Amino acid sequence: MDSCCNSESLETIVEEAIHLSSTDIHLQCGEPIYLRHGDGLKATQFVCTTTLIEDILRRCGIASYEWQSIDEACSCCGVRIRVHLYRANQTICGTLRLLCHQQLKLDDNSEGQLLQKLCESHDGLLLVCGPTGSGKSFTLACCIDYINQTMERHIITLEDPIEFEFKPKKSLIHQRQLGADIKSMSDGIRDALREDTDVIMVGELRDRETLEAALHAAETGHLVMATMHTQRAVMAVHRMISLFPGEQQEEVRNQISQVLRAVICQRLLRWNKKFITIRDILLNTHAVANLIRTRKEPQIISIQETQLPMKTLEMAVRDAKVQYGSQQQLHTLLDQQLS
């Protein structure tokens, strides 16, 4: 590895990131370390060194680093960290995402109660969507923790990498990592069907093969929970259908209309060192299922607007404005979510 200047330990850097409510740590060997703070990057007094990189690799269980990029996870200061290392500018660089270090617990409000009810389902597909950094993984982890605390279930998680570690409580939990324990997400789902599994958590539905396996699992009596990268709840329905060729889409529409439980699409806003979550909520009622089957997804929004507890992103923004009163800067931040 390249030689670099001296720096502080990973613990010191992570503690600084936590103190500043930063979400990401940016590394380039021999250069100052940057923290993602709000909407911008802030340079720190710390410098990235080979010792720091080697410590991160050791925590990830990796003996050496050559040319390939690395996606792993490790722990530091009681926080799980998603690690991405890569080469740029002829040296080693990295981005460390600090996964939410709050206690895993569903909110004590109507949305939290809705998620609890969805977690109690015995089958079907529950999607948590949103852009990068919107807290999708944390929400899914809270759902898994709720099931683990309250129900006797066999839970299998399929992740890349494992982000939140669970110890069995009322439930039996097996966590599998892509590359280490399974060859692909779709293989992991198919394996889970032969392992007397009740709940399957898929880190992300990225491709047709994974979605196909997830829909089959949801059809055959398993609760499947997964994330997708979409900006709106209704867009998740369109995204799933669009992953299949035209001649399969009618069959897939029927499948989705039968197994989909809900789509929760969320945004995470930072305000006064706290996080505000706003959620676009879509439940698969009979009316919604009929619109999915008959290729009328654009009309789903009108159902969201009139049938509680469903809501659109616009409604979620209005609710947040009412909740937080006359804080104009926050209102501006909320309005930006609609642009």
Residue ranges and their predicted role:
Residues 2-339:
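Short, flexible helix-loop junctions that flank or precede catalytic/ligand sites
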